[in-house]
């Protein structure tokens, strides 16, 4: 899935996160900022990377500002931000 424009999903509220997606040529860059990075940083990275892989995202810039979100919320916000950033023609709904 190709990211063609910038998009946002989520909020800065407690137990949520804000995901920012932007196009970038050549590589995938994921930046994660979290209040619970020491305790759950590995799990947050894993969920974000698995979600991006399932969507077929191979390049772009993904910035995650986490406020203690659960895994299901992380997946939903990443999916929403990526889908908003695509042209809508190449969505593979069965992967969601």
Swiss-Prot record:
Family: Belongs to the CitD family.
Protein role: Covalent carrier of the coenzyme of citrate lyase.
Protein name: Citrate lyase acyl carrier protein
Residues where O-(phosphoribosyl dephospho-coenzyme A)serine is found: 14
Major place of residence: cytoplasm
Subunit structure, as described in the record: Oligomer with a subunit composition of (alpha,beta,gamma)6.
Subcellular location: Cytoplasm
Entry keyword annotation includes Cytoplasm: yes
Name of encoding gene: citD
InterPro entries (alphabetical): CitD, Mal_deCO2ase/Cit_lyase_ACP
A single GO cellular-component term on record: cytoplasm
Alphabetical keyword list: Cytoplasm, Phosphoprotein
Species annotation: Pectobacterium carotovorum subsp. carotovorum (strain PC1)
């Amino acid at each position: 899935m190709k990211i063609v424009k910038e998009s946002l999903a989520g909020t800065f509220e407690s137990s949520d996160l804000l995901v920012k997606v932007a196009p970038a040529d050549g590589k995938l860059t994921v930046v994660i900022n979290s209040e619970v990075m020491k305790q759950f940083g590995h799990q947050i990275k894993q969920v974000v990377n698995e979600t991006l892989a399932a969507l077929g995202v191979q390049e772009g810039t993904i910035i995650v500002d986490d406020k203690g979100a659960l895994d299901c919320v992380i997946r939903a916000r990443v999916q929403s931000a990526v889908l908003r950033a695509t042209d809508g023609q190449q969505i593979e709904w069965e992967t969601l």
